[in-house]
């Protein structure tokens, strides 16, 4: 079978988020080829994408070996032959045999059948991108590790901050989705949704289907915390550049699941940014036009960087700070002096 290598690599790239880091579930570190699609599954996420030229191939191949080999092949077209216990790939003067498992042992039946597709609100991905950094990482309160989708609202909170985004249209269904899944989902141009039993499915124009587990439970009512009456504070004009420098030290290589944060402290007419990771620390002091302002808070640094493309001010009350745009609100608890 002659196959376009570039198209095959693109298909494999699309489904990589469904791979597991360790094979706790059999074949969860493999690409499964089923008919005209390639599929991955890791118990939390399953992704499938169309593949051309391999419609008659059914089985699983170790993902790392296949992907890394194809990435090093220079020819645009390759030949793939399915033999008894291996797949033979020929390209130019090279050929490689990869172990091939004919039986698909991934528990894909858990994902369930995909029902009728419904159109998503056009700002749904923007809402997810804005909201998920506010989710908790502490699994002692699993509901707060999720983004809450309810009606025309997309909400997230770690109990220290709350984000609520108002969609232009109501969602076809209500559900809770883990922030870890959202982090991958927002990389796709999803336009349609189908809600199943314990799983929700999204589809792109190219035919990628991204499925992820939903979480059972009730998200807390955050509405009463979102309105703030207080003084307006204007951030320094050079703050975004300072945040970009701080971001180098906010990212933790040993814990990539943790959202990088920065601490913001305002006192005596200065705004002080601090960030720290396992390799070093950062501090920068900026002048403000608010000599009497005194507060501090911690926030996801990439959210704050993106925020300065939208607005440069916030409102300060006795115990919280509020940011607001046309369709969203973000409230953060002010840290006490003991917490500082």
Spell out what each predicted region is.
Residues 1-340:
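Structural preference for solvent-exposed beta-strand-turn elements
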